[in-house]
């Protein structure tokens, strides 16, 4: 059966730029999935997604014009139950009626267990046109669109008004109706660079015709690559690097159909402002690409991506420079105004900034942060007074003009204003870094003072918000407590502090009775659960569970423990020791009295005497290895007692009739369990 390329295009008004690439990929994948399910392609569909500001399209290779005929076999009742005394039973008659067949049309087949009646027929394949309308409509319905709209007198809804529909199979139009539009082969090109309608001659010529006649690079990936190449080329010419992240590049790609990269500039005096402010203004407000020199310093040149190609782009450049100049002038004004007051003098204004109405203002919060940060700094061996000072000033920039205009600069502007106020560099850096880590993979605070303030900030948030009942549920976490917990955990894995003690310190900083009394224990459990999530990114679940079963309160040696358990798990003796440990734990649950020391005089059998001797010899070795942080050695020592453990369980009845002997054997197993689980609960390995 011959196949041809299928093309589908929805011509729209300008689509949301931040969602464009996702919409294009979802639409293409859904169409391809529909074709696969309808068996209009053999195997996995080979498709290309297209997405530009005014269109979503998909091109699928090797699509059939008609489904292949299918042999259908409907199975009915067993032969043994289908005929009685030569007469068809009601079961057989009902099957034939339901299948739309006569009894004489039925056949007998073997279904692998028995002979059954069956109705076999050939289902004629349906044409592409009879299936495609539903496939496209389903693809449209599945698009991840949070808000839809209606347009004109239409009752149909979509993310933006849709004005055209192309459906081509090879060079032939496939007649379908989608979103109230009849399919055709006409589309529009670039809004300004293209004239009139474009007739797509063939599904395979779509991208080339859109580029040549329409001045549209239809492929999102193609436009992005072209923009990136042009940006890098311009930057090299200026001996600079482009300051841009993937999100900005994606957004700009979604704003243009015919990208042209241009160079522009601004006055040097603006460089006196913090470069973070200038970069944010250019990237966020104007979608420009700032340039950095070889030392990472901002230049007064930038790159912009225009959607127009002209012989003389100077008017485009001047227009963009004029807009940016106005933006930077506003920022410069805010910056100068802010310098008229110190951070310290701004603190009273924090009383008017509500943190949460149940736990007070930012001014009240600052009091708590100071005490928590000073406590943590002291525990870290850092300057408690400096940490307290940094915490005192950490939120002062929230009431500055600059942060009011650019909230993303909180902390950063505090650093610059602290320097201007004569604060130490360590305090200034701590003010900026106390928000770190802001997200997964973000860097940690660089100094102990900064870490103390960062820990204080996140602990106070976690404990305070949790304590008033705003607990994360499902996908709802308005105060980002999960992120705060992960940030705390990452820092504690670097610094050897007791997580439960820190939680209690944060809890005690609030007025008595303000927070739920269960908050410390609940947040500790929450942290333990988040720790498991964090560690399972790098280690198998059973290894993480084994280490966390010990409920470690200091996390700075977690990585060493996890690595040691991973090595132990590979030992030949590991599986048997894990099973034995599980058996030991189950037996210990049956103890009638408190477990204590082993009484050597009650050891009766050679096997238990041998195990006791082995445990006695093992104890100092494991204790020394754990004390030195040599967890691999501690775990590897366990392999030496496997013969004695095996012999004990093979030859000794633990639950003896003599109560004293039974208790002594349980005491022995408890002694063994303490050593086996000194690093991790190895009974959990393999589960």
From Swiss-Prot:
Catalytic activity: tRNA(Gly) + glycine + ATP = glycyl-tRNA(Gly) + AMP + diphosphate
Principal EC category: ligase
Recorded GO MF terms: arginine-tRNA ligase activity; ATP binding; glycine-tRNA ligase activity
Enzyme Commission number: 6.1.1.14
Major place of residence: cytoplasm
Gene Ontology annotations for the cellular component aspect, listed alphabetically: cytosol
InterPro entries: DALR_anticod-bd, Gly-tRNA-synth_bsu, Gly-tRNA-synth_heterodimer
Pfam families (alphabetical): DALR_1 (PF05746), tRNA_synt_2f (PF02092)
Superkingdom of the organism of origin: Bacteria
A GO BP entry: arginyl-tRNA aminoacylation
Keywords: Aminoacyl-tRNA synthetase, ATP-binding, Cytoplasm, Ligase, Nucleotide-binding, Protein biosynthesis
Annotated compartments: Cytoplasm
PANTHER family reported for this sequence: GLYCINE--TRNA LIGASE, CHLOROPLASTIC_MITOCHONDRIAL 2 (PTHR30075:SF2), GLYCYL-TRNA SYNTHETASE (PTHR30075)
Quaternary context: Tetramer of two alpha and two beta subunits.
Family: Belongs to the class-II aminoacyl-tRNA synthetase family.
NCBIfam families in alphabetical order: glyS (TIGR00211)
Protein name per the record: Glycine--tRNA ligase beta subunit
Source species of the chain: Neisseria gonorrhoeae (strain NCCP11945)
Gene coding for it: glyS
């Amino acid at each position: 059966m011959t196949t041809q390329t299928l093309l589908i295009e929805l011509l729209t008004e300008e689509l949301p730029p931040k969602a464009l690439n996702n919409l294009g990929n979802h639409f293409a994948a859904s169409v391809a999935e529909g074709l696969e399910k309808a068996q209009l392609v053999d195997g996995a569909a080979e498709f290309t997604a297209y997405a530009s500001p005014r269109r979503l399209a998909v091109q699928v290779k090797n699509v059939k014009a008609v489904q292949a005929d299918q042999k259908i076999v409907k199975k009915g009742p067993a032969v043994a139950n289908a005929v009685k005394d030569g007469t068809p039973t009601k079961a057989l008659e009902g099957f034939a009626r339901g299948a739309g067949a006569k009894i004489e049309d039925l056949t007998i087949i073997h279904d692998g267990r028995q002979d059954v009646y069956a109705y076999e027929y050939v289902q004629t394949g349906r044409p592409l046109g009879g299936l495609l309308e539903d496939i496209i409509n389903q693809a449209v319905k599945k698009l991840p669109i949070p808000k839809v709209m209606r347009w004109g007198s239409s009752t149909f809804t979509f993310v933006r008004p849709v004005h055209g529909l192309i459906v081509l199979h090879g060079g032939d139009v496939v007649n379908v109706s989608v979103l109230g539009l009849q399919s055709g082969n006409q589309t529009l090109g670039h809004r300004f660079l293209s004239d009139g309608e474009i007739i797509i001659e063939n599904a395979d010529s779509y991208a080339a015709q859109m580029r040549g006649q329409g001045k549209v690079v239809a492929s999102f990936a193609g436009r992005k690559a072209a923009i990136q190449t042009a940006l890098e080329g311009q930057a090299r010419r200026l001996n600079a690097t482009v300051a841009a992240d993937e999100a900005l590049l994606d957004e700009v790609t979604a704003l243009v159909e015919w990208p042209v990269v241009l160079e522009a500039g601004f006055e040097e005096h603006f460089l006196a402002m913090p470069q973070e402010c200038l970069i944010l203004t250019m990237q966020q407000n104007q979608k420009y690409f700032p340039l950095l020199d070889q030392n990472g310093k901002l230049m007064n040149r930038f790159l912009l991506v225009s959607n127009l190609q002209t012989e003389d782009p100077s008017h485009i450049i001047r227009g963009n420079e004029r807009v940016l100049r106005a933006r930077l002038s506003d920022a410069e004004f805010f910056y100068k105004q802010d310098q008229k007051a110190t951070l310290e003098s701004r603190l009273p204004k924090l009383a008017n900034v509500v943190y949460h109405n149940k736990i007070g203002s930012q001014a009240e919060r600052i009091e708590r942060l100071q005490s928590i940060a000073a406590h943590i700094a002291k525990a870290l061996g850092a300057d408690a007074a400096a940490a307290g000072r940094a915490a005192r000033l950490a939120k002062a920039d929230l009431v500055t003009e600059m942060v009011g205009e650019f909230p993303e600069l909180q902390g950063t502007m505090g650093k610059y204003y602290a320097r201007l106020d004569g604060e130490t560099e360590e305090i200034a850096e701590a003010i900026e870094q106390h928000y770190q880590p802001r997200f997964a993979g973000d860097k940690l605070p660089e100094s102990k003072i900064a870490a103390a303030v960062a820990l204080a900030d996140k602990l106070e948030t976690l404990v305070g918000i949790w304590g008033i009942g705003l607990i994360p549920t499902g996908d709802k976490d308005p105060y980002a407590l999960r992120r705060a917990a992960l940030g705390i955990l990452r820092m504690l894995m670097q610094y050897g502090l007791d997580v439960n003690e820190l939680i209690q310190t944060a809890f005690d900083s609030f007025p008595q009775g303000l927070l739920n009394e269960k908050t410390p224990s609940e947040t500790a459990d929450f942290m333990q659960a988040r720790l498991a999530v964090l560690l399972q990114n790098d280690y198998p679940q059973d290894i993480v569970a084994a280490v966390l079963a010990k409920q470690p309160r200091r996390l700075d040696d977690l990585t060493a423990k996890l690595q040691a358990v991973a090595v132990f798990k590979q030992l030949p003796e590991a599986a048997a020791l894990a099973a034995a440990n599980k058996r030991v734990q189950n037996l210990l649950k049956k103890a009638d009295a408190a477990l204590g020391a082993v009484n050597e005089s009650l050891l009766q059998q050679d096997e238990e005497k041998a195990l006791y001797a082995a445990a006695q010899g093992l104890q100092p070795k494991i204790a020394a290895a754990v004390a030195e942080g040599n967890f691999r050695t501690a775990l590897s020592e366990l392999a030496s007692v496997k013969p004695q453990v095996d012999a004990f369980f093979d030859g000794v009845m633990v639950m003896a009739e003599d109560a004293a002997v039974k208790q002594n054997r349980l005491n022995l197993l408890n002694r063994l369990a303490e050593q086996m689980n000194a690093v991790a609960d190895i009974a959990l390995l393999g589960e």
